[in-house]
Every structure is written in structure tokens, then in C-alpha cells.
């Protein structure tokens, strides 16, 4: 084998080994891993690991026969199950399908995701009814979190969506949300958010 072929083979082997290691890290972590942390663990250059992540994402996300995919959120990567299999995963975990969000929670979540950061009082005004319990449910489900406080008397809490919200709805970032114009046929929702 020539020296050039030997080097190419060595590079391919190293690349495959690193992909395997990164795949293991994502699997074991269960949580999103920052690219800088992956680089530190595998002791490789940021750009090189970023390219490997892109290759891994293409492999996982491009193969419809796989039940898992790699998502990227705010500079982190996570191995997750594909949403098309959620019905079966719920059966395995014996989750109650009735754990869905109430109409009030869905309305509040829609307002928060399009108007964030926003206070509870502003949500109440848009909905026309109190939203405290709906917001509390969203916080419990880790779809919404306190993002700060408004600098006015009383310093009301500002709410915004979480990374869990993005994962739950298979979004990379808030820019992936459907345009509010798409909801104009459903005047109730668009009227609430546009107010």
C-alpha cells in the first residue's frame, strides 16, 4: 500500500472512530451537548467536529428507516426519537395520552411563542380571561420559563419558550414557527396574537 493510500485510510478510520465516539456521547448524555464540549472531550478542532456533526446529521436525518435523529438547538446537539414514532414510545412508557394541553394552555402557549417576552397580565388581556393556571401548566411541562422581570412597578415576570418547547414541536429555533399570516383563516388565533 502506498504512503498516500495509507494516510487516506488512516484519516477515514480516524473519522469513523470519532463519529462513533460522538454518537456514543450523544446517546449516553440524553441531554443536548454543546459543540465546544464535544470538541473538548474528543480533543479535536471545532471546525472538524462541526463537519463530523453535519455528516452524522445527514446520516441519521436522511435515512427514513431510522427511528432516531440528531437535532441542533442553539449550538447544541441531541439524539432524539423521530416524532412519527411517538405513539409507540408512549405505549412503551405507558404515558397517558390525556396529558395533552388544555385549550387555555394552548392559547397561552401560542401567545407566548409569538409575543415573547410577555407578562401574565398581557396574556390575560389578549385572551380576555385569567391565564395563571394555564401558564403554570406550561411551566410544569417545561415548555415555558421565566425569562426575566419587566422594569415597572411590581416587576412582573416575563415568560418565554424553552429549548424543550423547540424539541417538543421539532423546531430548530423560533424562526421555524409558522408565519402568523397562515393562521388568518382561523381569526380567533390570529386576532389573539396580533392584539
From Swiss-Prot:
UniProt xrefs under InterPro entries: ScpB_csome_segregation (IPR005234), WH-like_DNA-bd_sf (IPR036388), WH_DNA-bd_sf (IPR036390)
Subcellular location: Cytoplasm
Cellular-component GO terms for this entry: cytoplasm
Coiled coil: none
Keyword terms of this UniProt record: Cell cycle, Cell division, Chromosome partition, Cytoplasm
GO biological process: cell division; chromosome separation; DNA replication
The keyword Zinc belongs to this UniProt entry's keyword annotation: no
Presence of keyword rRNA-binding: no
Function description: Participates in chromosomal partition during cell division. May act via the formation of a condensin-like complex containing Smc and ScpA that pull DNA away from mid-cell into both cell halves.
Name listed for the protein in its UniProt record: Segregation and condensation protein B
Species per Swiss-Prot/TrEMBL record: Clostridium perfringens (strain SM101 / Type A)
Gene transcribed to yield this protein: scpB
Amino acid at each position: 500500500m502506498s504512503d498516500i493510500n495509507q494516510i487516506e485510510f488512516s484519516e477515514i478510520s480516524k473519522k469513523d472512530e470519532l463519529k462513533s465516539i460522538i454518537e456514543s456521547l450523544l446517546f449516553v448524555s440524553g441531554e443536548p451537548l454543546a459543540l465546544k464540549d464535544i470538541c473538548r472531550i474528543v480533543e479535536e478542532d471545532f471546525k472538524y467536529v462541526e463537519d463530523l456533526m453535519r455528516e452524522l446529521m445527514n446520516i441519521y436525518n436522511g435515512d427514513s428507516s431510522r427511528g432516531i435523529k440528531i437535532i441542533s438547538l442553539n449550538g447544541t446537539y441531541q439524539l432524539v426519537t423521530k416524532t412519527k414514532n411517538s405513539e409507540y414510545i408512549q405505549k412503551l412508557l405507558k404515558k397517558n395520552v390525556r396529558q395533552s394541553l388544555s385549550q387555555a394552555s394552548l392559547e397561552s402557549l401560542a401567545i407566548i411563542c409569538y409575543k415573547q417576552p410577555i407578562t401574565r397580565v398581557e396574556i390575560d388581556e389578549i385572551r380576555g380571561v385569567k391565564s395563571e393556571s394555564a401558564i403554570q401548566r406550561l411551566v410544569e411541562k417545561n415548555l415555558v420559563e421565566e425569562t426575566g422581570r419587566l422594569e415597572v412597578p411590581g416587576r412582573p415576570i416575563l415568560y418565554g419558550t424553552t429549548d424543550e418547547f423547540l424539541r417538543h414541536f421539532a423546531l430548530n429555533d423560533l424562526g421555524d414557527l409558522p408565519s402568523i399570516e397562515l393562521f388568518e383563516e382561523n381569526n380567533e388565533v390570529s386576532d389573539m396574537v396580533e392584539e
